[in-house]
């Protein structure tokens, strides 16, 4: 294909308009010359010929290679582009048929009008019939004649809203006009003026749809084009081209134009006179209008209607296919036309035109001289010298632009130098009557220079003022036409007030909380109910007000803009931060202090630790901050603004005469983008995208290993033995003491050792025993200590505290540097009663630091970050004391536990090649014949192959992109909340035999395959309806190795039980039963064979291996064993920050405690706790106040409730809020004070004062990573200092039986002498994406103690399991008590309903969403994975009678291109790479405008308005179900509503009998903030194990005491 020549090139109308706007920006000084040339080149590049494109690329290369200066480059590019514009051809130079054949789209093909004339010989509306056409066509640029100096007519150059005209199809090719030929072509033609019915059609609201709007818009766009030379000439004027004098009013379009003579006279006059003339024409246009008369006018109209009908005829199929094939080369659809002044869409049915002023309306300057407005009597003298500006009020006002389009004054047009005027009745400033009575009708006041707001401080009514060149006007009531615009302004101002007060009064509020506040606020008079749509509509203004408020913040103060709710609002609405609107005067916002919470009650111990840690750190951080400049985005207006020269930072700058030491940026240039980004970086999403595929068996380091530490071999001093060896072997001689220079070292001493790396600190070790090798090397066995800084405590540790670890090594005596002292600090006998003492340092064992004295009190596990009591092991009888090492003994025991050990061999050896056993010991379990075992899913498979559930991809070709324009965004197959990637649960087998072969020592198990319901031919449906622990016996067998066995479980026949299956299942998590056998070949169920009912296979063993009994006897023995569990006394629990009691409920289910006391400040949550724990004392007071009273010796609270005293509390649990800090990685001095005064410090002080036996702190997963782990380290440091054993971990609630991803950080602590609990193993499989539970502490990765990382005993719990049995309800259902529809359908439902005497379903109620939100929910499909991207783009009548609009796509999308039908995909100018334009915003659309606006930057907002999947799970916590909230999918899978309170409660694992209190939002918040009871119950079961172990150990010690006394007496 031959390349296009210059003369063949076409500039489309939309590109022409963009060039014109760019020219105007250059003339106004809004853009630099460099930016102008670059943007102009970018706009025109695709329309240039290949030769010119190559030439421009060559110039770029020369500029990069520095062969060309930047100025020379810009000049050459500008010259090339100007030449191109001069010589380009018209866009409609071809006929309709030729355009079509060349692949042009229909709209361009039908553009046949040239030179402002129609095919019937009439000129277009508003154009002159003179010859001054300047060679300009309605489609684009043509070569201009140098003789023509005047511009085009008004409608051609300035107006984007000319009435389009059409040819009849244009069967003949139009000739391009040259020189003044364009004017000649227009001579003698009739001017078209609108008839009555046409004029009425312009002004009336849209009552019917017009199919030809798009076509008319295209031609209207093509009829207004301006040569580049004209733009350059007009740039010499004082006023910008955008505000040119030739811009007419809307009424002037309908008036008869002056004669040719008058026009020529006008053009010869000055530009200021033209302005005045146009203003007069605009105001008096109605008087000058003339109606078309005679048949000529009607004929013109009839011909045009016929042509419009021809336009909208559908294309033939063949043409349609051709059109699709060529859509890449032809522009399918162009952006709709906009008014150049107000930027409103010209075909918008809501576009309103100013109806005009009253006949007696005056000019502004005349009105201002009216004596009725004067406040003076004439005797004041020089009073006016003090008040330079007049101030009045105006009522019944209306704001409009130069085109008389009624428009909003708050959309940024004033800032863009657009002239806005207003009319109304001016009244004196003291007149508060909003009626027009007594007002002076005034027309065309302005233009408006600025607008401002007042009344932010305390008042409910916000006042708004306009400022013109002559006066200021406080606005009162709008006219009827302007009411919708005025209501929107009132909304946004009042909403700003609500938002700022909300941010002041709440700590770290989330977006859903903000929505609740907005939606529940009573709007001011005249405003509609506040909704999420109105919040998003006004987001830019509201955020700017918050930015203005933040301007008064101190440098290290947390900005309100960084609050979670504000960050989400900014992302959703696509707010541009850092805008500084020069022409809008915002009212000064009073900087109110946030409400001061009660000062934290902190014990001296906690306070001392905080002060000691932060004393040096804050100083270091301040130095670091001084040398570190604030980061900037470099894009926002704040970053690009100059320094103010007045603030403290500026005064320190060298350029302002300062020292330059601080190196801080101007206070007015605090970049909001970077502040928001830092806060975002500190957040960790609940759903981790990384899969947890690490296997514990692949850990490099095992617990109890010997450490190989690189040490210096070279002798540092002379070493000699001091005595004779205590034992001599062939290779070694053991000694008790040695002399190192002048220091004597004995067994049990501690020494400092030189590391091989001199940059590392000296190692510390205890000398366990010493010897000399046969080769002469003098050695000792070292048991290592680690410094506190080497543990998870890091920099928060006590510098004198060390921790022994289970690592030891043979070391050279010559590497010892010196002897040191390490003292064991034992807990005092009255440890539990000395909490909260005034001087916590009295128990310090080191009185003076000499650099070589240290102490220890806890043992440390580096792999799991556990601090435990140091336990000394006694030497076994077979190991001599002089070479006994407790670490080595622990190593051996750990190794034995990991190594399989055989039990008794069976006498009946059926196969000579095998050795049969009755049992084997492995990982602490004894596996016997007849036991059930857990196996990984890959160990064996079943004969029934289940259909793999995969999401069926929807072909994009099957989607109607015009109806579903956002569906193309659904490119990813992954759906958040889906279980498609969920692993399978363990396979379960029942051991038939255990054996090894004589040729191979590998232990093998032969097992019966036990089928789960989902493994049978019935599939998942059967699993959903069956108990979780039901199995089916099968005759199928599998052979596996003992090493792959994951655990042990109980598998019994239901007929062998002497209790019900429900009672049996309630006895523990690892109990399974079967009633039937399954035959996979015949796909049928049958009675199990008799051999399956034998709990132990018969066989005679050797030695102790005896045959086991059959049937109920063995089951009864197991039950008898369980019934002899060690009893223990339940703990007395204090639940701080109790909420509605999720933690307490879980501990009740575990049976470990009694909820004696609870503290909850929020009254609704406290009432809920009382309802569910009637025997508990619930305090609704501030926890700080209560602790202060107790520490002061008070016995009762202010309300007379009895306070717990020292020694009363045995279990302390709670989740203190960790809020109010910035997103920075470290504390600053202000935040340190804030943290010291936080609820975390209060909660730790509760622990210090009461010294309970067990302590639990629950928080969000982010808690462990916050501030570079500093918050976690401080909490652990305080617990260690108190004397507690402690650890931390991350748990996933979904792994304990709830259909929800909820990762939580849990700190556990146990008092000295107690056993520190481990974290519970997962019970249910869950999405691997959400199960990353490791934590990075510095460069160290801390793992969970869980062994079941790849699978778990039970399948995952789904949404279907949770709530499929609940009755159908509608949006806004409010009936608190209803009946169940039927019986429970799943095991989860059966358990969650409990044993109610009269089953009543409570709280199955849901939020009443607004009409628009309800319509959106109704149109979300029911298919899995559906969300907002599946919404149709249609107008819908809402339940309140209003109609939501169709979303309009007005811009090209650089990233996503066009649809398959050629439709645009951008809804804002930012889609094209430009700045956001406020006029692009759309509201009340079924597809929320904000989502496609910012979707490209935020993963297409996947999940908003998303439905839950029946087979999926809830995404994170739902504290307030909002379809556009951050909390994931909240729409019911099948019903058009958000999830109900009871459904949320079930997702957390609360029983149906559990009560909540308060409003529907209170109940949602109580549920969402609670700890899931199933997870709390799993933790409680681990605490229960520790209690039983401790009780059993105490009983054994008590039993040994009499024996010991008797032995001592006998010796005496």
From Swiss-Prot:
The active site is at residue 1218. CDD domains: BAH_Dnmt1_I. Residues 94-110, 193-212, 222-232, 260-289, 691-708 have a biased composition (Basic and acidic residues). The keyword Transferase applies. Keywords: DNA-binding, Metal-binding, Methyltransferase, Nucleus, Repeat, S-adenosyl-L-methionine, Transferase, Zinc, Zinc-finger. Residues 743-871, 967-1089 form the BAH domain. Residues 132-142 have a biased composition (Polar residues). SUPFAM superfamilies: S-adenosyl-L-methionine-dependent methyltransferases. Zn(2+) 2 binds at residues 644, 647, 650, 666. PANTHER family: CYTOSINE-SPECIFIC METHYLTRANSFERASE (PTHR10629), DNA (CYTOSINE-5)-METHYLTRANSFERASE 1 (PTHR10629:SF52). This is DNA (cytosine-5)-methyltransferase PliMCI. It comes from Paracentrotus lividus.
